[in-house]
A protein has these predicted regions:
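C-terminal-most transmembrane helix of multi-pass membrane proteins
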Residues: 16, 184-186, 220-272
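Hydrophobic transmembrane alpha-helices of multi-pass small-molecule transport proteins
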Residues: 23, 95-115, 135, 166, ...
Length: 272
């Protein structure tokens, strides 16, 4: 809705800068409850480590929305739920049985949602899968960095990095103007404050106290709200093929959240 009057880079640039600025009062009053682990990583580098994956994920998502529906985008982006435990295996995190079964079900769902009758995948669907991979990296980075820096400070930094990078692209590839920003004011404010400043900061704070796989499971509920939003507010609809894909992917998502035996131990841990 917000991109009716502004381009995706302009939308995300202003949105994330607003999200960063909205955290300034909380940075002043915030007190760290858990002592951070020692680190040699400079603060600016930490901002880039978590901000660049967020920039890639948010930008790919925003651009991809121009080539696919909000409902399909929501379900495809949710693939980070399955990418997180699989990539986590290479970071020393165990792979559970239900994670593997859930991944197979969800990939079948992705096929039915994204692949057309001529076995092609649309540009928007491909961008959304790359978006999911970017968010996977961001989740793992947050898991590592929130043990070493304040989650609120990290959030403000990653938002500013994402916003500035988007604004740079906006001035290169778009023509931002005040009239367009005024037309998208409410969507930008909503996503900047609630979807960005509040939601992403709560994610960062939560990831300080839980492993990335559990965090991705909770975050996956976004796909439910995204799909319902597309159906009820944007007059979108699912074909029978897409409905089968949605059911398969939803089953895979929820199955992966059920505790089960370990299939593979983390590769780093096993090799040590």
């Amino acid at each position: 809705v917000g991109m009716d009057t502004v381009g995706p880079f302009t939308f995300n640039g202003v949105r994330f800068v607003i999200g960063s600025l909205a955290l300034l009062p909380f940075l002043y009053f915030h007190r760290e409850g858990k002592s951070p682990l020692p680190t040699s990583i400079p603060l600016w580098a930490a901002f880039l480590m978590v901000g660049i994956p967020l920039f890639l994920g948010a930008t790919l998502q925003q651009v991809g929305l121009q080539y696919t529906t909000a409902s399909k985008a929501s379900f495809l982006t949710a693939n980070y739920l399955l990418m997180v435990p699989i990539t986590g295996l290479f970071l020393g995190q165990p792979l559970l049985r239900n994670h593997l079964i859930g991944a197979i079900l969800a990939m079948a769902g992705v096929y039915f949602i994204s692949i057309t009758s001529d076995f092609s995948i649309s540009l928007g669907d491909g961008l959304m899968l790359l978006c999911a991979l970017s968010f996977t990296v961001q989740i793992h980075m947050l898991n590592y960095l929130t043990q070493r820096f304040s989650p609120v400070l990290l959030s403000a930094g990653q938002f500013m990095v994402t916003g500035v990078l988007n604004l740079m692209l906006a001035f290169l590839f778009e023509t931002p103007d005040l009239a367009g920003l005024e037309g998208a004011a409410w969507p930008i404010l909503y996503t900047g404050i609630l979807s960005t400043s509040v939601a992403y900061t709560l994610q960062a704070v939560g990831q300080k106290y839980m492993p990335p796989t559990e965090a991705s499971m909770i975050l996956s509920m976004e796909m439910v709200f995204g799909g319902l939003s597309g159906l009820f507010f944007l007059d979108e609809s699912f074909t029978l093929r897409q409905t089968i894909g949605v059911i398969a992917m939803t089953l895979g998502v929820f199955l992966s959240q059920i505790p089960s035996p370990v299939l593979l131990s983390g590769l780093r841990r096993r090799n040590q």
